[in-house]
Amino acid sequence: MSDRKDVIIIGAGPVGLTLANLLGQYGVSTVVFEGGDELIDYPRAVGIDDEALRTMQTIGLVDKVLPHTVPDQKIRIVNGDRKILAEINPTTREFGWPRRNGFIQPLVDKALLEGLARYPHVEVRFGCRVEAFESDSDGVTATVSTPTGEERVTASYVVGCDGGRSLTRQHLGLKFDGETRSTRGLVIDVANDPIGTPHAVFGGDPSRGYATLSLPHGIRRWEFTLFEGESEEVAEDDAFVFSLLAPHVPDPARLNIIRRRVYAHHARVAEKFRVGRFLLAGDAAHVMPVVAGQGWNSGIRDALNLGWKLAAVVQGKASERLLDSYEDERREHVKAMVALSLNMANLVTDHNRLRTAVRDMAAAVVDRLPKARARLNSQGYKPMPKYDHGIVVPSKLPTWKSLPDREDAPRTVGMLFPQPTVRNEDGKSVLLDDATGQGWRVVVWNNDPTAFVSEVAAEKLARLGGVLVHAVPATQLPWAKAAAAPGVRVVGDESGVLKSWFDERPFSAIIVRPDHVVAAECLAQELDDVLNKVFTVATVTFEPQNA
């Protein structure tokens, strides 16, 4: 049997399923091959951040995901004497969602899988293992071992989302440089949470590091450092497990333990994320220690970055060179997340008493410095995506006399556009992305965008699935809606967040990509020229009918 698809995804984990949902939205014919017979039923990740929740919103599944989360989950880092070294408790909503959330991964994965039922052109096939590939100028043909025999499926592109042991990466012969730490971790999940408090604790105990987290639906997780010489078999040794839990609960023997697993701490990044018609995403491209909670979220960032680009290429709207920007944009941020994860792992798993004593003293100093303490509490140490190259058009600060000299003005190109609550055209309070749509957006403050965008550029934007957005103070919403040109979305800034955001910058027009990254910023009068520059760097290939 032979078949033809636009995209083959290997691996039905969270990254593969998220990417499949994104491609499904774009109408891209996709097949997901998963060697296992069903979704993995044990949670690897336990933290989902605001960026990932925004992605769940993008694919229309956030309402299915939220019931399985603990929003605004505070982390307390303590030493061996239970003294608090630091608190991490970000409470802002820059992107519309809580910034730290506990979650049950298998239930979220299930929501992602069920979401694909919306798309008849997307297929998920379990018990199907890709055994070999053949590539030519027309695409990639995969030989697939299925429960009913061998099949051959051809696609324009293959995305390996098949985990840290990725067969796709191995097929490409790519190095997976980095390190595997000598210490491992033992995960113990318990039903009927015996503690019940909503926060998480990271214990930097030199005798044995640990973490404990409240998870949804009455589940409690513990993670303990295992030392060299302690084998994987200790996970099944009740006496050993109870000895670990004895300092944490009144009676370990009465716990309802539902899961125990040993895992290794890896920190590795693939040599390349793209080789011709093959791409890697998620753990196939990078792995990191679990302590920072960014492995799962980094994979979701990969899917969001890659999805719109793959769709544009296979649908003939952009050159295949657009796919080169995936690695250009994602690699440095991934490396920063790996470094953060390693540093946090070293912080809480170090069992050298001299170093941990120095750590405790340093934490006491930070606690006495308001700015440093606030930065830690607000999670200011977390690297945010910032693309200096790729599908972005940097701009210089304007020098026109009507604009004050603002050398310290925030620069936004390559960073995520915020998502406040706004009023949509019906006057309802909604998140910005729901009011504007999820594709390309040209957002202009207090100005009709059609006055500054030519018909040719507007048609090109529309064929890319983009929209023009007129943002106004909420008081002006009825008037702006009545005066809006056909196709222009009008949003009312009910909270003042958008007005304040534009006020901090000497630009009034913003071009936002489908992954919510700002591609360009400019003055309204410059918009048409800058928009066409964005089309150029995005390798847009079709010409509008009015050209």
What residues fall within each predicted segment?
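N-terminal Rossmann-fold NAD(P) dinucleotide-binding loop
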Residues: 16-17
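Helical substrate-recognition/capping region of FAD-dependent monooxygenase/halogenase enzymes
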Residues: 2-6, 10, 25-26, 82, ...
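Core beta-strand elements of the Rossmann-like FAD/NAD(P) dinucleotide-binding domain
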Residues: 3-5, 148-157
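Glycine-rich FAD pyrophosphate-binding loop
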Residues: 24-44
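Active-site-adjacent segment of FAD-dependent monooxygenases/related oxidoreductases
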Residues: 41-44, 48-115, 215
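A conserved short coil-to-beta-strand element within the FAD-binding core of flavoproteins
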Residues: 126-140
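FAD/FMN-dependent oxidoreductases across multiple families
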Residues: 235-298, 318, 323, 340, ...
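Conserved FAD-binding catalytic core of PHBH/FMO-like flavoproteins
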Residues: 113-114, 119, 128, 157, ...
